[in-house]
Amino acid sequence: MKAWEIWTWQGHPCVLVSNQRRLDRKERVVVLKCQTLYAGDPLPRENEALLDEADGLDRRTVCACDLLYTAPKKDLKQRRGVVTFDRRRDISRKIIQGLAIAGL
């Protein structure tokens, strides 16, 4: 497993956002949970990132960047793709803005 890969977790795509050292050594990793978009679904909000075929996914997919999950590596199934470089920067910025830790 590598940082920024997209895997399936609990039936949905998720992005691995833990640093590589944690991914290599720990049993639980930090992920962003994502949701596939369908016709009629609302457009992504300012705290969400949009992924698509360029990232290896079959359909447009939205990832909430203001809520981090801890997932057991053993529960991550089927590597689906890798987030593009420009989208990594967008996701990183949205994580920082979305968490706004203690107003900092």
Model-identified regions with their sequence ranges:
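Conserved functional hotspots at enzyme active or ligand-binding sites that engage polyanionic ligands
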Residues: 1-104
